[in-house]
Amino acid sequence: MAQGSHQIDFQVLHDLRQKFPEVPEVVVSRCMLQNNNNLDACCAVLSQESTRYLYGEGDLNFSDESGISGLRNHMTSLNLDLQSQNVYHHGREGSRVNGSRTLTHSVSDGQLQGGQSNNELFQQEPQTAPAQVPQGFNVFGMPSTSGASNSTPHLGFHLGSKGTSNLSQQTPRFNPIMVTLAPNIQTGRSTPTSLHIHGVPPPVLNSPQGNSIYIRPYITTPSGAARQTQQHSGWVSQFNPVNPQQAYQPSQPGPWTTYPASNPLPHTSTQQPNQQGHQTSHVYMPISSPTTPQPPTVHSSASSQSSAHSQYNIQNISTGPRKNQIEIKLEPPQRNSSSKLRSSGPRTASTSSLVNSQTLNRNQPTVYIAASPPSTDEMISRSQPKVYISANASTGDEQGMRNQPTLFISTNSGASAASRNMSGQVSMGPAFIHHHPPKSRVLGGNSAASPRVVVTQPNTKYTFKITVSPNKPPAVSPGVVSPTFELTNLLNHPDHYVETETIQHLTDPTLAHVDRVSEARKLSMGSDDAAYTQALLVHQKARMERLQRELEMQKKKLDKLKSEVNEMENSLTRRRLKRSNSMSQIPSLEEMQQLRSCNRQLQIDIDCLTKEIDLFQARGPHFNPSAIHNFYDNIGFVGPVPPKPKDQRSTIKAPKTQDTEDEEGAQWNCTACTFLNHPALIRCEQCEMPRHF
């Protein structure tokens, strides 16, 4: 790739890859070369490219091979419909499923190699396919690694087949697709929660494969012990069905050890009339790469079931720790017509999987898990467990079998979970899931619907569901944020897991005996599940009642608060009205002038009274201010005063008096009565008028 060029600044490349994870690394490298490692210029260009790659407008066709044509528009619409190999469907028809963003592509793990030959694409391996596999058909292929990053919530896929005109109907191309989950996923509301794959290839008549899903864990460390003949002991015809449990009992159970849900039978075929409800199969696969000594395989060996709860087997859920695992639950559709049941042969204990064995119809999915050594391409990503999901038309043609459209899911795990088992440690690599359409048997006009594959991750906050449905749009599965296994499907849909029909056994007494033992075991496990479910329901009902009581108390408190708020609002309204009324009583301008004149007059009166009080205090306590105004009323006779008779004594003393007056000063004249007073007097002798008024 462009990383090998000495002109690229790897620090800038790393920053741009972190900032624009949805843009392929080839585009980022080319942009850096064009802009001479200028970070700002590259950000400006990649911000435009990011929108294209986010919303399905970019070009992911990094290879000219026609087999990669299904990866256009960032795996928005993965049409692998094998009936229309000669027609190229546009890839954007499913780009807005559930309002989701599309999965973006990354070539960090290498370019997509769709042009490999059949010999390069499918490596030779031990017998890991069902017994009816045609000669030379290898169920599991080994595609080169490819990458995608930043899966977003509610990712919608339409799994149908895209082909080109140069491909024939009998030889569909093997289109590997890899979806990589970012290792730094943060917990939050925007955490990726679900992955939908819709559109299963239609059933093919007289197909020996049936509707099957194959899960194949790859071993990154080649080991002879890992390639034991015990891996494919379920497919050999020399298998002894009398004691089938020997293949499932490891000497030392580890975290990834699996126990069968029922007694497996090598290729039993039973009748189940009027089968209703859903049959489910569960596969738990590790998200983080576990370390197990030998990776044997487990096949969903299925015999008949009749328990009301046996079809929802959760008894193996608590077997060992399931941290960082993916659960793949297979729920076939409802089918009322009677059909034959096919059960696959038993396998050994799973390396990193937990399979609940189910009675599987030919029109219902089966799960197969096989182990195989890795290739040179897989040695690069040995710490990343991967899941390959492919849909095959099962036409019976060997070349058509080998060219299988495949979906490759890779989860980047930070640390690998260690587990102890019988021998050394082996890091588990990818696993394959091959989906094979069943034989189409139409009885009475009833046709089989498509199965649904749900992939979840228990004991974590992320849930990934893969739904396969060709006839209806994808359902919203937002994921379950819970640290424990969820029983919501069982509680919310109890009718889907009820089966009361009787089972017709084969004439072989040995097989019938093993079948009855399996049914008895499933009945006991189903009763345990029913008891646990009943206890859980009682607990949930008690919790619901307590929450209802708390809700009533909160409602009463809310009503009380509402009444108080209303009372306070009414009081505030009254105060505002009162204030507005007082503001309306402001006096006019004329009234203000009158009040001002009154205030001035009052101030004058106050000053006069103050002076009178001071005068009263100066004259003494006997001062009568009212007497000042009527002084002349009481003055008496105002005529001339007759002269007094002259006396000798008075004439002699007169000059002496004149001298005393000159010495004391001039007499002062009263302003009220004009009486001459002595200079020493401050008041008039006649009228008591002050000298200085």
From Swiss-Prot:
ZnF bounds (RanBP2-type): 663-693
GO annotation (BP), single: response to lipopolysaccharide
Glycyl lysine isopeptide (Lys-Gly) (interchain with G-Cter in ubiquitin) cross-link, chain position(s): K611
Keyword NAD: no
GO cellular component, as recorded: cytoplasm; cytosol; endosome membrane; lysosomal membrane
Family annotation (PROSITE patterns): CUE, ZF_RANBP2_1, ZF_RANBP2_2
Residue numbers spanned by region Disordered: 90-117, 224-310, 330-361, 564-583, 640-663
Chief place where the protein resides: membrane
SUPFAM superfamilies membership: Ran binding protein zinc finger-like
PTM text: SUMOylated by TRIM60; leading to inhibition of MAPK/NF-kappaB activation and the innate immune response. Ubiquitinated; following IL1 stimulation or TRAF6 overexpression. Ubiquitination involves RBCK1 leading to proteasomal degradation. Ubiquitinated at Lys-611 by TRIM45 leading to proteasomal degradation.
Membrane topology (UniProt): Peripheral membrane protein
Ranges of biased composition (kind: Polar residues): 97-117, 224-282, 334-361
Keywords from the UniProt entry: Coiled coil, Cytoplasm, Endosome, Isopeptide bond, Lysosome, Membrane, Metal-binding, Methylation, Phosphoprotein, Ubl conjugation, Zinc, Zinc-finger
Biased composition range(s): Low complexity: 286-310
Function: Adapter required to activate the JNK and NF-kappa-B signaling pathways through the specific recognition of 'Lys-63'-linked polyubiquitin chains by its RanBP2-type zinc finger (NZF). Acts as an adapter linking MAP3K7/TAK1 and TRAF6 to 'Lys-63'-linked polyubiquitin chains.
Note on domains (UniProt): The RanBP2-type zinc finger (NZF) mediates binding to two consecutive 'Lys-63'-linked ubiquitins.
Protein name per the record: TGF-beta-activated kinase 1 and MAP3K7-binding protein 2
